[in-house]
Design a protein with these regions (language model features):
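Extracellular/periplasmic, surface-exposed regions of secreted and cell-surface proteins
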Residues: 3-62, 73-392, 539, 543-628
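Intrinsically disordered, low-complexity regions of eukaryotic proteins
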Residues: 5, 289, 340, 411, ...
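Extracytoplasmic gating/loop element in the C-terminal half of outer-membrane beta-barrel translocons
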Residues: 14, 67-70, 187, 426, ...
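A structural signal for short, well-ordered beta-strand segments and their strand-loop junctions
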Residues: 46, 65, 481-483
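Short, positively charged
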Residues: 143, 445-448, 536-537
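Conserved small-residue
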Residues: 242, 344-461, 501, 511, ...
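Aromatic-residue-lined binding/catalytic grooves and analogous aromatic/hydrophobic interfacial grooves
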Residues: 405, 469, 626
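Glycine-rich, aromatic-lined ligand/substrate-binding cores of catalytic
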Residues: 460-495
Length: 628
């Protein structure tokens, strides 16, 4: 400093070193109880009770310290204007009661079973937060050792679910199978007039292989069962009190008579008629077993319709100054399929198996009141839906190339006919986008599906063609098994510190980020960089095809090698079994992303998210299983 003293520079590392740590204590209490009564043969009455309390106490101290800002002559600055000590205590109580009866009966070739019961769940959350400013002593912060203002807050939330349920099963000779289920549930999250819903389901199966007319296939057909099912379930995944026009007190920034007054926020618009989402699923499938069940195949095709999806309702005029209330505003449809194939066999003393499964699905919005077809997210970060929209779609710009010096005249101005991002003046090395509407400006129009400007759908972040491969072999006590898992297709938009070079002033440069534009290196992958990510960084990092990543991958989930000692070696020692094993988890992943990015854990976000997530750990295990 100018006075000869020294201070740490304001870096993230020094903020951690000089700042006070946050302490958190957690407790988890869980009680379970179960009673089973058998009044008479074939009938069991079961009562189950669960209580779970999770509590936490967090102590946080924002202490005040001085640092050198490192920008303008290393001026001395304070981390905060006033120190603050804060204690937050909260507890969540969950209780569940289930009382149900099971009845089974067999008469000849007829098998019958029935279940009926009652269910009730309750959830209660209570939190108290107290804070005070200006601590006398940084080493002994407490609410009583402050000289500044107090702040006290309290939060409370609860909801209840109560319902009846049943299940009926019938089969004849193991060939004709029938099942029906149903629930009648009520939730306090919904208005009293629309609190309850009935959710039935039914399924049937036919074991064709057991029919006499299939006797000709006994030499190779072990099992053939056709299945069909349809069912409804209810979804109440919405915050409580959405139908209550509540007001919240707050302290505004203005001062009246020397102090901040207490003000009330006006209540939000509410709906008194929204209710459960109803999710109905239609499924067709078959189970196939061949060659004494050495080869097995299971296939399912399904269509899932969500009716009355809970979402903000129709658009309201901007002059109203309020958001649309929660309503059953949308319908969506998912279609998908899944296939699983397994082979088990033995060759001499070697037994082995190999399995493969593959599934895929897509989801489309079938109905939503969004006449202007707004794109993106609202102020609360919730996605705008629109009719015909595929969930997961990525809107962005098609990248043409990077600007070159030939795109500018001798005065540094763009030549006629070459577009630029609206509001920015490009330089050589910046990103040049495709101007679809030929107006000379790259923009998102009105940011709607009706007028997206130069934006187009450039990808979809839904995981497609997810698959798994498993296999193993055993020979005289020695066995080896493996599990592979992967995704066949996925687009990922990644724009964070781990992907983009010089993300902010304290970013680390990784070796995967060194291919950036310079006047001497014009055929680079990354564009021109700007100090502290200013300049045209925002224009260069708009969602685009150039940096859209391929999220497909194959991961080696597990490899296990084991050896079981012969029983004749163990009998003299009084042991029944001794197995030695070595196992590896999450060993390798083959993907298309830059080094350091995990296709399963990577944060896909715009500039503003640092992108750090904890990856799946690679683990090695060695152990002995002994049975006496």
């Amino acid at each position: 400093m100018e006075d000869g003293s020294s201070l740490p520079i304001n870096t993230p590392r020094n903020q951690i070193i000089l700042g006070a740590p946050t302490e958190k204590k957690r407790d988890n209490l869980r009680l379970l109880g179960k009673v089973t009564i058998t009044p008479f043969k074939d009938l069991k009455v079961i009562a189950e009770y669960t209580f779970n309390r999770k509590s936490a106490e967090t102590t946080k101290y924002d202490n005040k310290f001085e640092y050198a800002n490192g920008i303008s002559n290393f001026n001395k600055e304070s981390s905060i204007a006033n120190s603050k000590y804060e204690i937050t205590s909260g507890a969540t109580d969950y209780t569940a009661l289930n009382i149900y009866g099971n009845y089974t009966k067999t008469v000849g070739k007829h098998d019958f079973s029935a279940m009926a019961g009652f269910n009730q769940e309750s959830y209660t959350y209570h939190e108290v937060k107290s804070a005070r400013w200006d601590m006398i002593n940084d080493n002994l912060p407490s609410l009583s050792q402050g000289t500044g203002a107090y702040e006290n807050k309290e939060a409370f939330s609860e909801y209840r679910v109560r319902g009846l349920f049943y299940r009926l099963n019938y089969s004849f000779a193991g060939k004709y199978l029938f099942e029906t289920n149903g629930r009648y549930d009520g939730s306090s999250k919904f208005p009293s007039e629309s609190r309850f819903g009935f959710f039935p389901s039914v399924s049937a199966g036919w074991r064709v292989s057991e029919e006499r007319f299939m006797d000709w296939s006994d030499s190779f057909l072990s099992n053939l069962k056709l299945r069909v099912s349809w069912g409804n379930i209810g979804n109440q995944n919405v915050d409580p009190y959405q139908f209550v026009p509540a007001m919240e007190a707050f302290r505004p920034n203005w001062v009246v008579d020397g102090s901040k007054p207490t003000a009330l926020e006006p209540p939000a618009l509410v709906s008194n008629s929204f209710t459960w989402e109803k999710v109905s699923t239609l499924d067709f499938g078959f189970d196939l077993g061949l060659f004494n069940n050495r080869l097995n195949m299971v296939f399912d095709w399904y269509r899932r319709d969500t009716k009355g999806m809970l979402a903000p309702g129709m658009e309201l005029p901007g002059v109203l100054g309020a958001k649309a209330p929660m309503q059953n505003a949308a319908d969506l449809r998912s279609k998908g399929w899944e296939i699983s194939i397994d082979w088990n066999d033995r060759i001499g003393n070697v037994s082995y198996y190999l399995g493969f499964n593959l599934y895929d699905s897509r989801t489309k919005i079938m109905k939503y009141d969004n006449e202007s077809q707004l794109l993106g997210k609202d102020a609360d970060g919730k996605l705008y839906y629109r009719e015909g929209m595929d969930l997961g779609e990525i809107w962005g710009y098609h990248t043409d190339r990077l600007y070159t010096e030939d795109d500018f005249d001798v005065n540094g101005n763009l030549k006629p006919g070459i577009p630029k991002v609206e509001g920015y003046n490009p330089n050589p090395g910046d990103v040049l986008y495709v101007d679809y509407n030929n107006d000379g400006l790259i923009n998102n129009g009105t940011n709607t599906g009706l007028d997206p400007g130069d934006m187009r759908i450039i990808g979809n972040n839904t995981r497609r063609y997810q698959y798994g491969i498993r296999g193993g072999a055993a020979w005289k006590g020695l066995s080896l098994s493996f599990i592979l898992q992967g995704v066949g297709k996925r687009d990922m938009w990644i724009m964070n510190e781990l992907f983009y070079p010089h993300y902010d002033e304290f970013s680390t440069f990784y070796d995967t980020q060194l291919d950036y534009w310079t006047p001497e290196h014009t055929d680079s992958y990354f564009p021109r960089l700007y100090q502290m990510s200013k300049g045209n960084t925002a224009a260069n990092t708009m969602t685009q095809t150039r940096y859209l990543q391929n999220g497909a991958y194959l991961s080696i989930r597990n490899i296990t090698l084991s050896y079981s000692l012969p029983k004749k070696w163990l009998t003299p020692w009084g042991a029944k079994n001794l197995q030695i094993f070595f196992s590896g988890e999450n060993l390798f992943t083959f993907d298309h992303l830059p080094k350091g990015l995990d296709p399963e854990r990577t944060v896909t976000d715009d500039l503003g998210s640092r992108g750090f997530t904890y990856p799946y750990m690679r683990q090695y295990s060695f152990g002995i299983n002994l049975t006496l």
